[in-house]
């Protein structure tokens, strides 16, 4: 049999006309009986067949017939006189159907010729290879399972509008193999993290999404109202304080993979709703956390991609090498060597320099900022975006780390790190502050900052203080941004590419 050159259906100028024509076809189907049947069960998937019979030639398949039942979406159709082909796509991949009136009957064949691209179809038949060597299903029975009323995008142009890809992700997934690959990699990444945590004796838990007091991070919360309790509540900005309550309760290793919500801007790195993995381990510190996090991320890459060496936006990123470790001032002087030690400890200089770089130092967060907070702001302006290779920035100042344990040896510094790759923060962790009186004092300072106009400053959580007063063992805790990690592993330039349904403005 010969396979003619593929011809594409003409692109209709009026999509509404296409939809109207398809609705007419659906009405005809309804008149014939059940328009959306649900009694077909596939026995095989496309990728499974392509893999299992990759080495089976035409003669082998003829000598040992393989009966299959396959269903999926019709992506291409080539109708000829007495023999036609259709490319059908299921959740695993694609396979070709070969359809003739002799095999399926003249009535079914005539109906098939009227079916549209995008329709969900099913076939029972036997495998064979065409003269060109393509593995195909010779259909003995052919059925229409679901009529597609809307046409798929043109094959050659696809979903050219990027926002439309986000808004109609269901269509994007149908027509863009790379999108499907991205979300499969995301699932593999999360599965790998879960296995890694369970193998390290961590227990997965679930903590509340609705909080009476927002806490665990410096962020602006979403506010809602609980009608039955008649009280204001907040979508959680972080699970940290609840997870540490569990450490107090005796669960010495816990983790949670779930959503956080922050009522802030949208950018290539930020979405108001995002996925975090936070974990806490008793009798550890931030040094242990850095080693553990490094191993976890390396293993996630291997499990998702098969390698620890990845390509991101045209540059290589080697996760197999030991991650770098720098203090805030070391990072500044590495990537902006014009700054001297004296300048980095000069309050007036730092404020002037930040203003020159475009930072509004008059905002509430800077009014009473100390040297450490000013150094951090300068780091964010001069060094952060240049941290391509995996790098831990360590020793954050107390004033910007209200939940972290202070250093025993260096005044004003905490045992805290943030992990950066490709210029983005991926993780944040520290030895946890378990002194209830110190924690209460820091909460009070946060309240003062909030009263001064800093919307992201923390509230005073009296119940959390009460939990600490029961005694929390020395603990290390870390949060990893799952979305940003998946961005790296899938070479995605924006967080929207790794969220199935990112937040968008309303359609007009």
UniProtKB/Swiss-Prot annotation:
Keyword Nucleotide-binding: yes
Superkingdom assignment: Bacteria
Cofactor binding mode and count: Binds 3 Mg(2+) ions per subunit.
Cofactors demanded by this protein: Mg(2+)
Chain segments annotated as coiled-coil in the UniProt record: none
PROSITE patterns: AA_TRNA_LIGASE_II
Pfam families reported for this sequence: tRNA-synt_2, tRNA_anti-codon
InterPro entries: Aa-tRNA-synt_II, aa-tRNA-synth_II, aa-tRNA-synth_II/BPL/LPL, Lys-tRNA-ligase_II, Lys-tRNA-ligase_II_N, Lys-tRNA-synth_II_C, NA-bd_OB-fold, NA-bd_OB_tRNA
Record keywords: Aminoacyl-tRNA synthetase, ATP-binding, Cytoplasm, Ligase, Magnesium, Metal-binding, Nucleotide-binding, Protein biosynthesis
Catalysis performed (reactions): tRNA(Lys) + L-lysine + ATP = L-lysyl-tRNA(Lys) + AMP + diphosphate
Binding site for Mg(2+) 2: 425
GO molecular function (one): ATP binding
Name of the protein this chain belongs to: Lysine--tRNA ligase
Record organism: Burkholderia vietnamiensis (strain G4 / LMG 22486)
């Amino acid at each position: 049999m010969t396979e003619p050159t593929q011809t594409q259906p003409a692109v209709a100028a009026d999509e509404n006309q296409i939809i109207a024509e398809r609705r007419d076809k659906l009405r005809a189907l309804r008149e014939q009986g059940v328009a959306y049947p649900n009694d077909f069960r596939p026995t095989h998937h496309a990728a499974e067949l392509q893999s299992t019979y990759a080495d089976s030639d035409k003669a082998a398949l003829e000598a040992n017939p393989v009966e299959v039942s396959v269903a999926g979406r019709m992506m291409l159709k080539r109708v000829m006189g007495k023999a036609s082909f259709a490319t059908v796509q299921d959740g695993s991949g694609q396979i070709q159907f070969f359809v003739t009136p002799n095999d399926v009957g003249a009535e079914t064949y005539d109906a098939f010729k009227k079916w549209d691209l995008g329709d969900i179809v099913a076939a029972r038949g036997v495998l064979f290879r065409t003269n060109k060597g393509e593995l195909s299903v010779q259909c003995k029975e052919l059925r229409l399972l679901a009529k597609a009323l809307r046409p798929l995008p043109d094959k050659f142009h696809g979903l050219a509008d990027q926002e439309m890809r986000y808004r109609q992700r269901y269509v994007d997934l149908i027509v863009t193999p790379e999108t499907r690959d991205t979300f499969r990699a995301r699932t593999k990444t999360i599965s790998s993290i879960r296995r890694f945590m369970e193998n390290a004796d961590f227990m997965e838990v679930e903590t509340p999404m609705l909080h009476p007091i927002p806490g665990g991070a410096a962020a602006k919360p979403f506010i809602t109202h609980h009608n039955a309790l008649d009280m204001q509540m907040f979508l959680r900005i972080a699970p940290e304080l609840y997870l540490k309550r569990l450490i107090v309760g005796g669960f010495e290793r816990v983790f949670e993979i779930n959503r956080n919500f922050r009522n802030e801007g949208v950018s290539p790195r930020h979405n108001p709703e995002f996925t975090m993995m936070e974990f806490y381990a008793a009798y550890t510190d931030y040094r242990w956390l850095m080693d553990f996090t490094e191993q976890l991320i390396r293993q996630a890459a291997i499990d998702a991609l098969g390698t620890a060496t990845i390509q991101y936006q045209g540059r290589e990123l080697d996760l197999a090498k030991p991650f770098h470790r720098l203090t805030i001032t070391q990072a500044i002087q590495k990537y902006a060597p014009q700054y001297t030690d004296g300048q980095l400890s000069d309050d007036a200089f730092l404020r002037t320099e930040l203003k020159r770089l475009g930072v509004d130092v008059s905002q509430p967060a800077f009014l009473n900022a100390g040297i450490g907070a000013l150094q951090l702001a300068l780091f964010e302006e001069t060094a952060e975006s240049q941290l391509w290779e995996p790098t831990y920035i360590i020793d954050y100042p107390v004033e910007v780390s209200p939940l972290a344990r202070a250093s025993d040896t260096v005044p004003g510094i905490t045992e805290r790190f943030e992990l950066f790759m490709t210029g983005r923060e991926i993780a944040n962790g520290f030895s946890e502050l378990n002194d209830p009186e110190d924690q209460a004092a820091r909460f009070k300072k946060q309240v003062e900052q909030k009263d001064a106009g800093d919307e992201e400053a923390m509230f005073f959580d009296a119940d959390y203080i009460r939990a600490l007063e029961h005694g929390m063992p020395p603990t290390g805790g870390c949060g990893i941004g799952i979305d940003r990690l998946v961005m790296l592993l899938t070479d995605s330039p924006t967080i929207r590419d790794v969220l199935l349904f990112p937040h968008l403005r309303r359609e007009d």
